[in-house]
Regions:
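N-terminal carbohydrate-binding/catalytic regions of secreted carbohydrate-active enzymes
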Residues: 109-211, 215, 375, 379, ...
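Surface-exposed substrate-engagement region within the catalytic domains
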Residues: 126-140, 144, 258, 273-392
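N-terminal low-complexity, Pro/Thr-rich disordered segments
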Residues: 44-134, 194
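Hydrophobic faces of well-ordered beta-strands that scaffold small-molecule active sites
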Residues: 112-120, 126, 150-151, 179-181, ...
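Hydrophobic membrane-insertion alpha-helices, especially the h-region
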Residues: 27-38
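Substrate-binding cleft of extracellular glycoside hydrolase catalytic domains
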Residues: 167-264, 282, 293
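Terminal targeting segments of Actinobacterial cell-envelope proteins
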Residues: 1-23
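Surface-exposed cleft-lining segments at the edges of enzyme active sites
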Residues: 148-156, 195-200, 230-241, 265-272, ...
């Protein structure tokens, strides 16, 4: 590693330590209680334990605890060479680990997501750079680190949010690629659960969204607006739900007015949560059916349900929403390559695999993109600290 590269990495880590010290808000946004025994995180290769220690990062993706789901049949990971092919039928025979990727497969997979932006400041990229001789390095690099993933903004810091969002969107526009950003600061998020946090009230949230929108720039960007904010709103009173949905509708308008090329998607939960008509009714109250505030819905964030189930579900939601013809859906495929675990486990469950690579060309009507919204390898809280990168977990997903 060159001296300049080492200096840059050291400076970036120092900035992360300063960011982590800004207070408990980030921790509250990202921490999920560890479940089960830490002894379950032994590396497949049983190498130096030090390389498995996770480093916290201020903008990592929080762990969203999914609603207990009916077990899903696993979905085979399709060949990366044909990401636009229709979702295959579920098959129980697909639970075998995927083979180690070849150089050809890596090249084809990267091409599938070429229009999406890979933000260069991430835990997985740091780990790959810091551990070049680790025997897991090539698999993690080629199958995870080389692919674009969403950038989360989970801490309520109004003073610098515009600059932080702009750093991502300007990086994407500079390369002619599309970044994916996730504002995650709605008050009372996670219904007081492990990922609770966010803005102190809706007035503060509205002001924060204004500043977030100011960083969107003028080129294409995808906004995954507040995961779980609609599907998981049962804990609110009727009046509180009305107020939240009004703020979400306002947020969509503000984001699209700030950047007309921004594509804003609203929370549809996932296929094993609310029924499509119930979810559509909630979405309609939050502005998701209006072309002035919405480009459609997203599903399966941080979850494991197979892509074909989510394709069917999101189309049903859009139909029930009576949405304008141009509205579509995006699906998180980051960890759904082997379907949901039979026991409903949500915290770093064993046997999960990477799903379809991120792409804006799905080959499916009304499905605008397959995205990696949850960053593969970032723990739910059982394989490592919640939201922190675990190379052992990443390797298990990727191999």
């Amino acid at each position: 590693m060159s001296g300049l590269r080492a200096q840059r990495l050291a400076a970036r880590r120092a900035e992360r330590r300063r960011a982590a010290g800004r207070g408990a808000m980030v921790a509250a946004a990202c921490v999920v209680a560890a479940v089960g025994s830490i002894t379950g995180m032994v590396s497949a290769l049983d190498d130096d334990r030090g390389t498995d220690e996770a480093r916290p990062q201020a903008t990592r993706s929080p762990s969203l605890r999914p609603k207990p789901a009916v077990p899903s049949a696993p979905e085979p990971s399709p060949p990366p060479a044909s990401p636009s092919s229709a979702a295959p039928s579920p098959s129980r025979t697909s639970s075998k680990p995927s083979p180690t990727p070849t150089a050809t497969k890596t090249k084809e997979t990267v091409a599938a997501s070429a229009r999406l932006y890979r933000y260069p400041d991430s835990q997985v990229l740091d780990w790959v750079a810091d551990n070049p001789t680790d025997p897991r390095n090539e698999v993690i690099k080629s199958r995870i680190a080389d692919h674009p993933a969403a950038v989360w903004f989970a801490d309520y810091t109004p003073s610098d949010i515009t600059a932080r969002v702009s750093a991502v969107t300007s990086g994407g526009s500079g390369q002619g690629r599309v970044p994916v950003v996730v504002p995650y600061a709605i008050p009372d998020r996670d219904c007081g659960g492990a990922s609770q946090g966010g803005a102190p009230d809706l007035d503060a949230y509205d002001a924060w969204i204004d500043r977030f929108a100011a960083g969107l720039g003028s080129e294409e960007v995808i906004v995954i607006l507040e995961p779980d904010s609609i599907a998981q709103s049962d804990c609110l009173s009727s009046a509180e739900r009305i107020d939240r949905f009004a703020s979400l509708a306002r947020a969509g308008r503000v984001l699209k007015e700030a950047n007309p090329k921004a594509r804003v998607y609203y929370d549809a939960g996932h296929s094993e949560w609310n029924a499509p008509d119930k979810q559509a009714a909630l979405l309609g109250k939050a502005g998701a059916a209006s072309a002035g505030s919405s480009d459609g819905v997203f599903s399966n964030v941080s979850n494991f349900n197979p892509t074909n189930a989510e394709v069917t579900y999101t189309r049903q939601v859009l139909d029930a929403l009576d949405a304008p013809a141009g509205l579509g859906a995006v699906i998180d495929t980051s960890r759904n390559g082997n379907g949901a675990p039979a026991d409903g486990e949500w915290c770093d469950p064993a046997g999960r695999k990477l799903g379809r690579p991120p792409t804006l060309s799905t080959g499916e009507a009304r499905i605008d993109a397959y995205l990696w919204v949850k960053l593969p390898g970032e723990s739910d809280g059982c394989k490592g600290a919640a939201g922190a990168f675990s190379p052992g977990y990443a390797y298990d997903l990727a191999r």
